[in-house]
């Protein structure tokens, strides 16, 4: 019932601060707003290793439960605020994550590293991760059989209808408010579960 009520709600429309409409969304090749970053580590270093998961970018020891031992020569440095994704997938779905957790971090050599220019990074990450149209198109662009690969070149060549930068900023601010509310609800649920366990101790 609640789901049907949500589906009947009017589509959100974002406007300028003066109430005017933003320009129509324009088809844009991602390569026009993606700036690749290529810097690698070799030998001893003090960078922490991050893993790009569907739940977000995570410290490797948090993701696997322990610190992994392996050769990190050739790993890609990912500066704070830059984006990455695991280019291999078992089901054709890819997660694009922004580094918001570490100033000195590296990711696998198979993870392209880049940033968005003349675009809002928060909006773009949410758009690539959440839009059904994007997911469908990226799954088509990926190649392979049991495990498919979305190359960085294929990603940059993909074209999508995108709003102007000002509208992206508005949408991103709204999404960040929603994310904050979601995190607050998760904290509340965790506290209630802890309280519930205490009742029956």
Show which residues each predicted segment covers.
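Conserved small/polar residues in nucleotide/adenosyl-binding loops
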Residues: 1-5
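Non-catalytic DNA-recognition/assembly elements of restriction-modification systems
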Residues: 13-41, 165
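Short, solvent-exposed loop/turn positions at domain surfaces
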Residues: 16-19, 66-72, 144, 176
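Sequence-specific dsDNA recognition surfaces
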Residues: 31-83
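A short beta-sheet element
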Residues: 74-132, 139
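A short glycine-rich beta-alpha junction/loop motif
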Residues: 105-110, 143-166
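Extracellular/lumenal glycan-associated surfaces
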Residues: 169-181
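Amphipathic alpha-helical coiled-coil segments
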Residues: 178, 182-185, 189-192
